[in-house]
Amino acid sequence: GGTPECAVQTLEPVTVSLTSSYPATIKGKQDVEIRPQVSGFITKVCVDEGSMVRKGQVLFVIDPTQYEAAARSAKAAVATAEAAVSTQQITVNNKRELNKKNIISDYDLAMAENSLASAKAQLASAKAQLISAEQNLGFTNVKSPSDGIVNNIPYRLGSLVSPSIQTPLTVVSDITEMFVYASLTEK
């Protein structure tokens, strides 16, 4: 007996691709929820889902009517307060001259000076209200805080929105960098 014979085959190298599928989520570097800072009806949707936007670009317009009226009213209040300060300043100047000549008492002069201080305080308050009114008017143009892609837009023309809404107007995803999140099993 000798060595038993066996079949011999020469192997050739071949390229084999092994593929596996895994669920994954692709996200941008940062997702920013877009929420209104004032209440009102959406009068214009300026972008489409999936569109690229730039920082500062208007995404939505909220009806500005009431905010324009509030800004006009605040401007009028500032003008009224400025006039009151001017009038009170003239009164104080006149009373100072009369007081120097002993025509009116120190008390009368002090009352006029207090009225001037009060008018100046009302002017400062009116100016603060004007700044707030103009800021709210500006918030009727809902702008993108960054460059990115607009995600789903659940609100449409005519929707009533407010700062307390549960769902954001949309999400802008900064895609300057992309990240893939996958779940890999240990098998």
Q: What are the language-model segments listed below?
A:
Residues 4-7, 147, 167, 175-178, ...:
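Beta-strand/loop subdomains of soluble extracytoplasmic proteins
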Residues 26-28:
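Structural recognition of beta-strand segments within beta-rich domains
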Residues 1-23, 186-187:
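Acidic, gly/proline-rich low-complexity N-terminal segments at the extreme N terminus
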Residues 11, 18-21, 33-164, 177-181:
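Amphipathic alpha-helical coiled-coil/rod segments that serve as protein-protein coupling scaffolds
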